[in-house]
Regions:
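Beta-strand/loop substructures that line and gate deep hydrophobic ligand-binding cavities in soluble
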Residues: 80-133, 149-151
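Residue-level detector of alpha-helix boundaries and kinks
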Residues: 1, 11, 52, 77, ...
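Hydrophobic ligand-binding cavity/cleft-lining segments
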Residues: 1-40, 45
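Glycine-rich portal/gate segments that line the openings of hydrophobic small-molecule binding cavities
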Residues: 37-87, 97-100, 133-151
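Hydrophobic pocket/interface hotspot
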Residues: 16-20, 26, 50, 67, ...
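Hydrophobic beta-strand positions in extracellular immunoglobulin-like domains
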Residues: 9, 54, 105-107
Length: 151
């Protein structure tokens, strides 16, 4: 399953990228990540890896994520190595003094989590709603004077 969502924020691309690419900020705008802990010596950029706990439906699923692609001020892509099977991330494009941020995610649900078509529908809606909510939270954070006006 996959989806893509975009939003435009009134924040320079470098500040938007810096905020999103700092693992310590992910829980502030990704509502379906309950916990995240670095497990690699490198904690920023290529080579960084994190143990996370995703909330999917009613289940908490431990998942290890690796930074697969890191292009400063352009793209951050994460891929799971175990747990929930996911690949996704953010693309950043400057638009005037603001930034267009696109979040995309491809995922496969673990066996046993989906028993009926209704389960699948509810989980897909949960992921979609979480992505939309996350982008709105991210917009709110990035447009706050604390982030936007930081030198």
């Amino acid at each position: 399953m996959q989806f893509k969502r975009s939003i435009v924020v009134s924040c320079p691309v470098d500040k938007a990228f810096d905020y999103v690419s700092d693992w310590q900020n992910l829980k502030s705008f990704l509502s379906n990540i309950l916990d995240i802990t670095p497990i690699s010596f490198v904690q920023y950029g290529p080579g960084a890896a994190f143990d996370t706990v995703f909330k999917v439906g009613g289940a908490n699923i431990p998942t290890t994520l690796d930074v697969q692609e890191f292009v400063r001020d352009q793209r951050l892509i994460l891929r799971s190595r175990h747990g929930l099977k996911v690949i996704g991330g953010w693309e950043f494009k400057p638009i005037g003094s603001g930034t267009s941020i696109t979040f995309s995610l491809q995922y496969d649900l673990p066996p046993g989590l989906v028993r009926t078509a209704k389960d699948k529908e509810l989980i897909e809606k949960d992921f979609s709603d979480a992505a939309s909510q996350s982008l709105q939270l991210l917009k709110w954070v990035l447009e706050s004077p604390t982030i936007r006006d930081r030198e």
